[in-house]
């Protein structure tokens, strides 16, 4: 992998890339892990980068709850993005990839609903997306990469041979999140979760830069009525028909 890759939308990749885009709660993370395990490829959780940036911005005393963000705050967040000291390390005990900011394990701190809302806000800043673009492309390494995000197939790896768009109804995603939190002993209102998901969808789909839309030629899967194993089977079947050599 060359470090000096072009940051244009006509990026020519040397290795194999599968992109999996879609809204929060559709099951992208689980699907990405399953596909990567099947192929023995690397994983990029691009959403984690934006969640980490949201945490870093709040640590720098930038109030992300005030909307719209001021130009000064946007500039400050962009500077943080350009100097973000992030690593992803494999936990040999759990098998999970854990995020580190400035050598400190963020653990589950970036997986809260608040972190997701913060990520959506910083991701709407065009200069932030530019700052993180090259960093995301640097994850592309042999033997291949499965990239999970919202603009992986439209912007970051727009020439990927396989593009997946995984979606589900807002109601279904709210129910899934509600059940996850209840199982963890966290009391929450499903109505509040649904409102939060709809607000994030609105922000992600209508931002001026890299809005959340299926990439041209993407294989669209609605997981609302499907189990994750059914989604996985559909995706592997699609890959096998379109690019069978990737499964060899």
What does each of the following model-derived ranges do?
Residues 31:
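Hydrophobic positions on the alpha1 helix immediately C-terminal to the Walker A/P-loop
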Residues 106-184:
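ATP-dependent NMP and nucleoside kinases share a basic, alpha-helical "lid"
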Residues 24:
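The conserved Walker
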Residues 38-110:
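N-terminal phosphate/diphosphate-binding loop that engages ATP/GTP or pyrophosphate donors
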Residues 28:
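Conserved lysine of the Walker
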Residues 20:
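Hydrophobic anchor at the beta1->P-loop junction of P-loop NTPases
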Residues 1-17:
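Extreme N-terminal, non-catalytic leader segments
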Residues 90-91, 136-142, 150-159, 184-234:
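Small-molecule kinase domains that catalyze NTP-dependent phosphoryl transfer to phosphate-bearing small molecules
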């Amino acid at each position: 992998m060359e470090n000096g890759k072009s940051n244009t939308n006509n990026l020519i990749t040397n290795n194999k890339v599968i992109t999996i885009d879609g809204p929060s709660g559709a099951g992208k993370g689980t699907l990405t892990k399953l596909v990567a395990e099947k192929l023995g490829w690397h994983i990029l959780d691009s959403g984690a980068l934006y969640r980490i940036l949201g945490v870093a911005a709040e640590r720098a005393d930038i109030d992300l709850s005030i909307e719209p963000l001021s130009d000064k705050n946007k500039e400050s967040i962009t500077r943080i993005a350009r100097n973000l000291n992030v690593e992803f390390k494999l936990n040999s005990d759990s098998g999970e990839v854990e995020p580190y900011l400035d050598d400190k394990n963020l653990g589950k701190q970036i997986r809260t609903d608040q972190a997701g809302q913060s990520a959506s806000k910083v991701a709407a800043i065009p200069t932030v997306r530019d700052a993180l673009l090259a960093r995301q492309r640097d994850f592309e390494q042999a033997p291949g990469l499965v990239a999970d995000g919202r603009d992986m197939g439209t912007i970051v790896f727009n020439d990927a041979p396989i593009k997946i768009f995984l979606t589900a109804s807002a109601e279904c995603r709210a129910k899934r999140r509600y059940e996850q939190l209840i199982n963890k002993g966290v009391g929450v209102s499903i109505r509040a979760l649904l409102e939060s998901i709809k607000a994030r969808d609105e922000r992600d789909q209508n931002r001026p830069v890299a809005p959340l839309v299926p990439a041209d030629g993407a294989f669209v899967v609605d997981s609302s009525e499907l189990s994750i194993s059914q989604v996985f089977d559909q995706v592997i079947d699609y890959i096998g028909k379109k690019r069978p050599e990737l499964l060899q």
